[in-house]
Amino acid sequence: MAIPASRLVNITPRVISSGSTELELAGVLLTKNAIMPYPLLMGFTGQQAVGEYFGYDSDEYRLAVIYFLGFTNSSKKPNTLYFFRRADKAIAGALIGSQALGVTDLQKITEGGFIISVDGSPVTVTNLNLSTAKTQSDIAGLIQAKVTGTTVTFNTNQKNYRIVSNTTGNDSSVTYATNGTNVEALGTDVATALGLTAAAGAVVSQGTAAMTPTQTMNAAIKQSENWVSFTTVYQASTAEALELAAWSNSNLNKFLYCAYSMDAGQVAGGDSSLPGQLAFNDYEGTINTYDNGEVSVFVMSCAASIDWNREQGAISWAFKTQSGLAPTCTDDQTQASLLDNKVNFYGRYASRSEQFNIFYDGAMSGGSYGFVDVYINMIWLQNVMQTACLNGMQQTQRLPYVDRGYTMIKAWLTDPINRALTNGVIDPGVKLSEAQKAQLYQEAGEDISTELYTNGFVIRVTDPAPEVRATRGTPNISVWYTYGGSVNKIEFPLTAVV
């Protein structure tokens, strides 16, 4: 027996975290496909998984192939592609089963039963006899005969049963199956054998009334905001595209809507065309492409392929390529019209000896950022700064309204800024116009142009008003940074001196 050493030296273990998980610049595809459960934001980590779920002949798979390829010579590839149900019409509630046992095993069910609820009313299934079934469709028909008010089908891709209510709207529903009778020959119960229980991995898809594009996007971000770009699997109408653009604009530099169309108005322009309306409303957060969806998804893929931890990892979208992606613009007049309308495209250019298929030119449809790389860089930097400040506030005992506290804030912001200097989001040495210098002087109350030119960034943290301090509001914090953009065109005279 001895006196514990902790009476003299007591060490409390602690950890200073390296930080939180960063925002993933993943993409979301809105789909009307009936096999997509609502309101699940379903993520896939590869094109094969998309093909296995939606089918290899589906548009979802076709677009996923493009998304996961990234751009040629990218140092990383996209990690995740999400899908979300676009319910432009009222949809039915459904139970989407997990993979069920095969027909031979299910034939051993002769007096099966379980309880399931349809549209709020419980249905008790008894005497379910599958012994005569020859196919999965036979089994689906036998289940449907017992579960009144539903349609039951078997999905050959997912190898599961789907029980769908015959009603639609907010009150339409099908619950998980419970209380399955045990089948000794299978070593499990009926509901589990059919893949209809929560424990087995079944998914409940809620019924809903028809939703507007705005309601759809708000439902999606309730599931997760760990994504940035989005577009539609189907061709959105001009009205729907404009509403999606308005939603992106209303969310303050958080999302990028990748609109697309092959409509003649993309080339001709005009007040009623999609580019005309996008320009008129000056929406922030939308890029428009001339294509059938594939180039739009390529835009999303480029964002998801950026390696923010790599030296000069930030990219320009112009001149990016992907093997197998078909050009959507092949003549000079069309490309000139598209560029005038701020419509992007995948173009075929040619010199006398070579042809080049490239994306061009990365312009945003409206707003103040000009090009998509500027916008995406801001989304990334905004998020890492927010995360750095939150991590810092969690790890410090308190943050006083004095120089010591303000120095801590500057330190928290310095780590993201150093990363931005490394990956190319921030470029020192950018020459400012006199108008820009004047605006900076007005905002900062001093001439910061030399510091900004030299360092690429300026941080200022100052005291707030006493009444702000009394309510524990924010200090006055401003961060300015410069970005050198990217050259989209080279022109010069070639002079022979003879």
Regions found by a protein language model. Give the residues of each.
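Helix N-terminus capping/helix-initiation residues
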Residues: 58, 195, 212, 329-332, ...
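Extended basic-aromatic, gly/pro-enriched interface segments that bind polyanionic ligands
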Residues: 3-11, 156, 277-414, 419
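Short beta-strand elements
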Residues: 114, 351, 479-483
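Polar low-complexity, Ser/Thr/Gly/Ala/Asp/Asn-rich disordered segments used for subunit assembly
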Residues: 1-25, 32-36, 41-122, 126-295, ...
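General structural signal for secondary-structure boundaries
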Residues: 46, 111, 211-213, 236-237, ...
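Structured, hydrophobic secondary-structure cores that serve as assembly/anchoring elements
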Residues: 1-60, 69-79, 360-498
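Short, surface-exposed charged micro-motifs
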Residues: 151-153, 346, 478
